[in-house]
Every structure is written in C-alpha cells, then in structure tokens.
Amino acid sequence: MSLSASLTLTRARTIGAVDPRLYGSFIEHLGRAVYGGIYEPGHPSADAYGFRQDVLNLIRELNVSMVRYPGGNFVSGYTWEDGIGPLEKRPRRLELAWKSVEPNLFGTDEFMHWCKLAGLAPMMAVNLGTRGIEAAGALVEYCNHPSGTAWSDLRIANGSKDPHNVKVWCLGNEMDGPWQIGHKTAEEYGRLACETAKVMKWTDPSIELVACGSSGRGMATFPAWESTVLEHTYEHVEYISLHTYYGNRTGDTPTFLARSLDMDRFIETVAATCDHVQAHKRSKKRLYLSFDEWNVWYHSNTADKAMEPWQVAPPLLEDVYNFEDALVVGCMLISLLKHADRVKMACLAQLVNVIAPIMTDNNGPAWCQTIYYPFQQAACFGPVSYTHLTLPTKRIV
C-alpha cells in the first residue's frame, strides 16, 4: 500500500524569535566538568588562570550562549564563600551530592572570568537546600553591586573591580527530588523561593529569576508541584525550570528516537499550568520556561555505581555517545525550537566530560562527541516557522 503526504512550509507563520539563550549549557562541580575539564593548571594549553584553551576553542565553536553554574545537585550543599579569595585559604570539603571531595580551587570569580573568555553569559544558581535568603542575597550583592558594601568591596579586594552583572539566577535545583540535599515539599519550597526572590530583587531589581519546576515529567508530584510553587512565586519570577534526560537501556531504538514527543508534552503541560496560575491570580504577566537540564544520559550508569567515593574530580557520568544519541539530541533541539514562544532558555547538560559534547584527557587532548554537531548546527538558526504535514486518514492494519 502506498501513502502520500504533503509538507507545507511558510515563513509567514512563525512561532516566534528564538532567544539566543536557548543554546545554553551547564557546568557543575561534578566529576571532571571543572577540574580536568575547563580548568587544569599545568595542562599544555592552559593559560595563566589554569583555563584549558583547547576546551575554550571548542566551546566557542559550539556557539554556546550561556552557562548555568555551579549546579545541579551540587549547589544544594554549596557554601559559595568557600570558593572566593586566596586559593591557599580555601577549604577542602566533602561534597555529599556526588560523594566527592571539593577543593574549591575554582569558584565564582574564576567562573565569571572564564565566561568572559568564552564569550558567554553566566546563569547562577543559589543554594536553597542547606541555605536560603541571606546567603542568596549576599551572593547577588557580591556579584552585582558596584561598591561601597562589605560584599561588593570583598569582590573588589578579590580582584574583580567591576560588577559581574549576572542577570539570570536559579532559585535552587530540583527541590522536588528526594535525592536533593534539603529536599522540600512544594509548599515549603514555594514559600522559601518567594521570600528569597524578594530579597534578591531588592538587592538588584534588574535580575531575572527561575523557580524550580519538576525534575522530570515522571515525578509523582508533577504537575501539582508547578501549580503550588507558582501560587507562591508567580509575581516574583520570570521563568520556571524543566529537566529531562532520555536513554535506551533496553535497545528499543524506535521508542528512543521518538522520546522528543515526551519532551513536547512536558513543555505543553508546564506551559498550561503556568497559564492556569496566571488566570487564577488574574495576572497580566506571562511566565516563560527555562529548560535548563536536558540531554541523553544512560551509558555511564553502571560504571558510576562502582566508583570509589571521596575523590577529587572522579570520572563520573562520562557517557560515550553514538549516532543514535546524536539523532535524539537533534530531535530534542527541534522540540525546543517548536516551543520557542514559551521556552526562552535551555541548557544542554552538561558541557565538558560529564554527559557532554566535549571530552578531555587529563594532560591530554580534547575532542568532540557526536552530540556536539546537532547542537552546533541548531545554534545558527533564527526565527522558527510552522510546518504543516497532511497525512491520509485511512487506518493501516
């Protein structure tokens, strides 16, 4: 039986302009993302700051617009003050999220300087797991206030005369997940996020904030979590986050290649929930979505379970990607583009070594994985057009 179909493409009907921040990525203090990834003093390509130039060149060629930092699960136990000031005075800490040791040789100021060299914008997350309002407000002051206060003057003393001017901030990470340090109910998180958002915006009214949405569409609390959180935070945030990862553990290629359809439904459900809360609050404000963790992730699961704990920068989540994975990443990018009217920011998680498009060897070369290339090509796109596909209605048995 032969079937016919027609595809109509028109530039007159656009979904919307693609925000450049749709092509963001993510660096977490996890595995070799930082140490041995973007930062490796003593490497043949490292500059005076310890930043690997071979990695920086690949990142520039990838067209990444923004990078989320420092986590991720890591941020829910992070004391940001540990990562500023003289290196020799920074403490080594047990890092509970990934059972590693954090030397704190790379912190806020190093990240900001690295972002400038890479030509991208920072997206900072604050700790709402073990910390809260005061620490978040202090970090905004440290990063963004010009001078004349304790925190801004400390930034200057640490070598950054000009403010870092971080414009996008995440209010914690995956607080709905039982694995999260300081896990909270939607009610608990919503109240804390609301009050933290107020203090952060009083410190710098120009910033934009991202509330924690569900850590996956399969969570039992989805989408009630979004509804409850937004009832508390709607007027104080600009975005709510979405996270998803897909894998092919059973070798079911057709289902794996279709997983972006699940991503479509995830986006549409969260957007509908946002609109419901907007209507309920009779608000004139429209909320947008930040898909700030997405990727293929499954290859490294077995090896990660066998990893010895309490190492500095152990090789965790080092998936080796194939062509099938690149196809799925390409389909996921199409899902983001199809919803460019609501999804304004997104972060491929992660950027280097950890489920990443770029891999390195310690004291060795850097190279690109298969998923590097669909992202690189998509980052060149502009406005998105509707496509209309007409199929015959006859049922096929």
Summary of predicted features, one role per range:
Residues S25, N63, C115, L139, ...:
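Conserved, mostly hydrophobic/aromatic
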Residues G37-A48, R90-N104, M124-T130, G172-G190, ...:
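The substrate-binding groove and active-site-proximal loops of carbohydrate-active enzymes
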